[in-house]
Amino acid sequence: MNTLNNINIEALAEQIVSRLTVEVEASGRHVHLSRAHLEALFGPGAQLTRVKDLSQPGQFVCAQRVTLEGPRGSIPNVVVLGPERKESQVEISLTDGVALGITPPVRLSGDIGGTPGVTLRYGDRAVRLDHGLIAAKRHVHMTPADAARFGVENGREVRLKCLTDRPLTLEGVEVRVSPQFATFAHIDYDEANACGFKKGDRALILP
């Protein structure tokens, strides 16, 4: 009986944690390419080669890789994510920016006006972006149902208490709500390393 009770208590505890928290994902450096830049790097008629799907519906990892080049250094083997974008965009960490010699502003994906550029290289082909380099602002993707459950709305900033090996609370986490999203919190590898993140970790949403 005690064993059954313990199992029931553990199952209930897991349900409660799941209801009160969101799963966290660490997002590494990556590139989104426009049609023009995809062809400039990989040849006329080039298509993105899907390798695996990401947690957000319609987003996927591609086989294509590029090298980022800045005034101080370069970063090879940077993954391209699909699908194609209207404008090319590069997301890196602040630490990556030091390696490149470029300071990326902290922005949400898609907010690339007035941002610095970077050179993308594949073999002997290169594209110089005059803008589009950012460090992604920490954020939470949410379905409308989950946003209602947590009592938040699109554009609101919350705190994220990471329940990790080195717990910490992240401020200024922007909520992004859409029926096209799956509910996940996204941090970069600087933040993930700081809190001892490992795959499957969760976080509390705090006001």
Q: How does the language model describe each region?
A:
Residues 167-169:
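Short coil-to-beta-strand transition motifs
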Residues 1-21:
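Protein-protein interaction and targeting regions used for scaffolding, dimerization, and localization
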Residues 21-31:
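Short amphipathic
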Residues 30-71, 76-123, 128-161, 172-202, ...:
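Short beta-strand-centered segments at strand-helix junctions
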Residues 164:
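Acidic, glycine-rich active-site loops and adjacent beta-strand->loop/helix elements
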